[in-house]
């Protein structure tokens, strides 16, 4: 007889092969058809809210793996918070204005350069196109949210709210217009924010320049003829704008003779200056303060400058003397403000010298082209002491990839310095994950100067300012609010469409030939940074519970949002901030769109969204996250383990109706009650990991449970009961009761990470509604839990000992499989009544307990004959001469003859 036909093998429609790229789209359609997102919001309407505010990605090109990492992390947070009993509305957003899009449009349509409205229309089309592409990519990841109603920074409603926030800042006197140095992109011809700067290695010319002391000053100070200040600079092109020299009040200075020349330099730096190794000290000055007020002659132009002290002068490099050009450096500017120096910047928006520079040879040249000419002029005058190549970190424009310059032009600023201390206090009130994020953003804010918010571009929200012919600016909160009301109806194109007179009339200003509308637009960091005001505030969700972005956003969105929120309402816009690293290759190099990063859609098509999500969950997201085929090969093994665990559970529940056939706790077998403790432990720690955003710990806990507790331990032990006991025996239903509870717990705990796989398994179990509407499982109360745990601690120790002894017997060829063995257990911890339990747990055919104070296990060959149905050895099987079922064991004979479980057949 073929006894294999009589055992109850697992059956399930849940396939072993996942085919994720092919199967996953079906579930997206199901979620759409069943309106799972809106149903979930309704189901949790009486629950506390948890608001994760989406940082808007830029609507420019396909989403890359870094974007995928970010969105998956957010969705894991939201799904887990939903299952923890929160209502979690998710409003995705897109950032649309700014240089990258305008730069792209201008390169494709150069003929539109003089037509602002046409440029803006093309920019809108471009942004809308990529929003739809990215939206589908993100939805394909299994992310639930308000995809049909996202927030988009170029929408009129959003722009209007942004302008109303701007009006508040103007009203609070945080906004001013000033002439001061700003980061200037020559490639894009606009001012840039600090967050739009990328530092790269750049080779420049470093020079030591002589600034001769004037004749009158020599006499006043008692200095010898031919004395010069020797200054070091890596930007020779700024020399035409030199108006002062700076020395340190904390350094001592010396007058040194080198050959026929005499130089004033910092004493501690003298020996490091080229050619100074044999210099002679003529005079000493205890402090830079002894030099303050001295005048010098400009090395290239017929004018004088004055020496001032400044704390920023370093004693680490150079000569201890810094040349000051207030129009081309922030520290220079600030020193100039103290001493009433002109903010002088003879450079146009293309980075070329104007006639104002006073040096005919360099007029019309770019500042970098002028370097060599200026050096040649200095050399010709005998005022170039040394020149050499110098490699340093230099700021570049993030979009044009060209080196930026500091240039002074009239711009609009937010007075960060005025409320910086409050912003720093708010940083301390926020929960930063990981904690090092606090110091990172603190450092960024502490060093932050006033924020240049005006841009000389068309594609952005216009600054609704008017200018008189005299240059006086009119920026009035009431006018801004009126304009915002109009923008809500018509959009910001209105500003570019109407003439100045029409705008004046529309906004309640008396039309005048003297008033001209401004053409500057707001920095795009104002766009995204005002999202707490534009999106959260109207929904009553401000402050958000969580902002979650890459670590670069300490300089970007986290900071702009913080500063605008503190400026408008005195508080941070978020309670917690979580940051993740960059996606990198195996060499640790960052992947990004512009450098040809792997396309997100391509990876979804290769691996499936669930495997990408498992990758995100498995990594320590706070660090840079490696991405490679090797990593995904290992992850595939983990995924197969999880999927196979779900399949085993489903397969062994094919004939189980939990509503009708579940057993109460007091009728469960002891091992089943113990395994419920294991499941309880998993539930408790996994929920805690989710709450604390420790997703790699979730991954490790769940994969370990599937591999060790479930597959290697529990399922291995249960197979005999599940396959060979009678279908409706209580022993089998006890196992199935706990397997069902295990399935429900495991599939729910996996759901935030593997939404597609768990949905498929959930529906395969007979459920008709989405798993994503469920809550996480609660821990079950288990009778005499501590006593049970202590007892099973001993059982598992014995199991380890038994396995070691069985392995020895196997190596000695005494046995093959465990079922060929009989164990003699010497112990005083267990009684004869535990024999059946320990036999089952140790996976042997027979076991005998002998009372002994010394714990020991002996292995013998099992007695009797192997049952052809269950493969256990039995004396009964040896003597069983049943005409229909000869040589089967007592248990199998009862099953085959349809006898009740309680019927006694003696072995």
From Swiss-Prot:
PANTHER family: ISOLEUCINE--TRNA LIGASE, MITOCHONDRIAL (PTHR42765:SF1), SOLEUCYL-TRNA SYNTHETASE (PTHR42765). It is found in: Cytoplasm. A motif ('KMSKS' region) lies at residues 590-594. This is Isoleucine--tRNA ligase. GO terms for molecular function: aminoacyl-tRNA deacylase activity; ATP binding; isoleucine-tRNA ligase activity; tRNA binding; zinc ion binding. Keywords: Aminoacyl-tRNA synthetase, ATP-binding, Cytoplasm, Ligase, Metal-binding, Nucleotide-binding, Protein biosynthesis, Zinc. The keyword Glycoprotein does not apply. ATP binds at residue 593. Binds 1 zinc ion per subunit. L-isoleucyl-5'-AMP binds at residue 549. Belongs to the class-I aminoacyl-tRNA synthetase family. IleS type 1 subfamily. NCBIfam families: ileS. It catalyses: tRNA(Ile) + L-isoleucine + ATP = L-isoleucyl-tRNA(Ile) + AMP + diphosphate. IleRS has two distinct active sites: one for aminoacylation and one for editing. The misactivated valine is translocated from the active site to the editing site, which sterically excludes the correctly activated isoleucine. The single editing site contains two valyl binding pockets, one specific for each substrate (Val-AMP or Val-tRNA(Ile)). A motif ('HIGH' region) lies at residues 57-67. Its cofactor is Zn(2+). Pfam families: Anticodon_1, tRNA-synt_1. It comes from Methylacidiphilum infernorum (isolate V4).
């Amino acid at each position: 007889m073929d006894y294999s036909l009589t055992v109850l093998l697992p059956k399930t429609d849940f396939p072993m092969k996942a085919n994720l790229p092919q199967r996953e789209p079906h579930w997206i359609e199901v979620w759409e058809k069943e309106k799972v997102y809106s149903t979930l919001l309704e189901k949790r309407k009486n629950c506390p809210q948890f608001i994760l505010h989406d940082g808007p990605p830029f609507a420019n090109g396909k989403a890359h793996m870094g974007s995928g990492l970010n969105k998956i992390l957010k969705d894991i947070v939201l799904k887990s918070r939903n299952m923890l009993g929160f209502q979690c509305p998710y409003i995705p957003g897109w950032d649309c204005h700014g240089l990258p899009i305008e730069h792209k449009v201008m390169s494709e349509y150069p003929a539109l350069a003089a037509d602002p409205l046409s440029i803006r229309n093309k920019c809108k089309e471009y942004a809308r196109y990529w929003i739809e592409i990215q939206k589908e990519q993100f939805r394909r990841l299994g992310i639930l949210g308000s995809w049909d109603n996202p927030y988009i920074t170029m929408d009129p409603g959003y722009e209007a709210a942004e302008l109303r926030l701007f009006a508040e800042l103007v009203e609070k006197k945080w906004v001013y217009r000033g002439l001061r140095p700003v980061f200037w992109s020559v490639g894009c011809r606009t001012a840039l924010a600090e967050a739009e700067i990328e530092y790269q290695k750049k080779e420049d010319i470093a020079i030591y320049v002589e600034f001769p002391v004037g004749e009158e000053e020599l006499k006043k100070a008692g200095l010898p003829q031919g004395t010069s200040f020797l200054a070091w600079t890596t930007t020779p092109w700024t020399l035409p704008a030199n108006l002062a020299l700076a020395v340190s009040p904390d350094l001592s200075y010396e007058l040194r003779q080198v050959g026929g020349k005499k130089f004033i330099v910092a004493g501690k730096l003298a020996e490091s200056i080229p050619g100074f190794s044999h210099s002679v000290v003529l005079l000493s000055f205890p402090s830079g303060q002894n030099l303050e007020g001295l005048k010098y002659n400009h090395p290239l132009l017929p004018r004088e400058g004055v020496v001032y002290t400044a704390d920023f002068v370093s004693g680490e490099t150079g000569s201890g003397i810094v040349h000051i050009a207030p129009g081309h450096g922030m520290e220079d500017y600030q020193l100039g403000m103290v001493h009433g120096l002109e903010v002088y910047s003879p450079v146009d928006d293309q980075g070329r010298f104007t006639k104002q520079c006073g040096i005919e040879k360099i007029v019309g040249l770019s500042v970098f082209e002028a370097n060599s000419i200026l050096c040649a002029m200095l050399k010709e005058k005998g005022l170039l002491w040394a020149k050499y190549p110098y490699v340093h970190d230099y700021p570049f424009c993030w979009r044009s990839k060209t080196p930026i310059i500091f240039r002074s032009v009239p711009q609009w600023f937010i007075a960060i310095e005025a409320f910086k201390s409050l912003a720093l206090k708010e940083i301390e009130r926020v929960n930063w994950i990981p904690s090092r994020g606090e110091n990172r953003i603190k450092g960024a804010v502490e060093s932050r100067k006033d924020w240049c918010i005006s841009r000389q571009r068309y594609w952005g929200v216009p600054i609704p300012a008017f200018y008189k012919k005299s240059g006086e600016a009119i920026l009035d909160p009431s006018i801004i609010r009126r304009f915002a009301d109009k923008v809500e109806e018509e959009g910001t194109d209105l500003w570019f469409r109407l003439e100045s007179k029409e705008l004046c009339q529309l906004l309640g200003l008396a039309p005048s030939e003297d008033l001209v509308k401004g053409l500057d637009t707001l920095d795009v960091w104002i766009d995204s940074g005002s999202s707490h005001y534009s999106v959260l505030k109207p929904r009553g969700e401000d402050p958000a519970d969580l902002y979650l972005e890459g670590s670069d956003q300490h300089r970007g969105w986290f900071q702009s949002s913080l500063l605008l929120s503190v400026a408008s309402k005195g508080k941070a816009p978020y309670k917690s901030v979580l940051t993740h690293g960059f996606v990198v290759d195996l060499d640790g190099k960052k992947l990004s769109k512009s450098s040809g990063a792997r396309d997100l859609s391509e990876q979804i098509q290769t691996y499936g969204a669930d495997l990408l999500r498992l990758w995100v969950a498995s990594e320590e997201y706070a660090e840079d996250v490696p991405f490679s085929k090797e990593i995904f090969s290992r992850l595939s093994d983990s995924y197969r383990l999880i999927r196979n665990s779900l399949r085993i559970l489903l397969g062994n529940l094919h004939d189980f109706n939990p509503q009708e056939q579940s057993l109460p706790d007091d009728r469960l077998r002891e091992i089943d009650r113990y395994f419920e403790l294991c499941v309880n432990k998993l539930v408790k720690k996994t929920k805690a990991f989710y709450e604390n955003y420790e997703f790699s710990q979730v991954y490790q806990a769940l994969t370990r449970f599937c591999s060790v507790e479930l597959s290697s331990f529990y399922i291995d032990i249960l197979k005999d009961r599940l396959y060979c006991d009678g279908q409706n025996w209580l022993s089998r239903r006890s196992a199935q009761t706990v397997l069902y509870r295990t399935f429900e717990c495991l599939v729910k705990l996996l759901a935030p990470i593997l939404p597609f796989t768990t949905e498929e398994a959930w529906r395969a179990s007979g459920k008709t509604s989405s798993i994503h509407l469920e809550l996480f499982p609660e821990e079950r109360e288990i009778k005499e839990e501590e006593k049970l745990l202590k007892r099973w601690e001993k059982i598992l120790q014995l199991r380890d000992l038994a396995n070691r002894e069985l392995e020895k017997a196997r190596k000695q060829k005494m046995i093959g499989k465990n079922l060929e063995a009989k164990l003699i257990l010497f112990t005083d911890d267990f009684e004869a009544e535990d024999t059946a339990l320990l036999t089952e747990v140790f996976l042997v055919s027979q076991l005998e307990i002998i009372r002994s104070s010394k714990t020991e296990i002996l292995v013998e060959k099992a007695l009797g004959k192997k049952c052809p149905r269950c493969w256990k050895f039995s004396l009964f099987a040896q003597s069983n001469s049943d005409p229909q079922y000869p040589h089967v064991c007592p248990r199998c004979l009862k099953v085959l003859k349809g006898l009740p479980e309680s019927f006694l057949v003696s072995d």
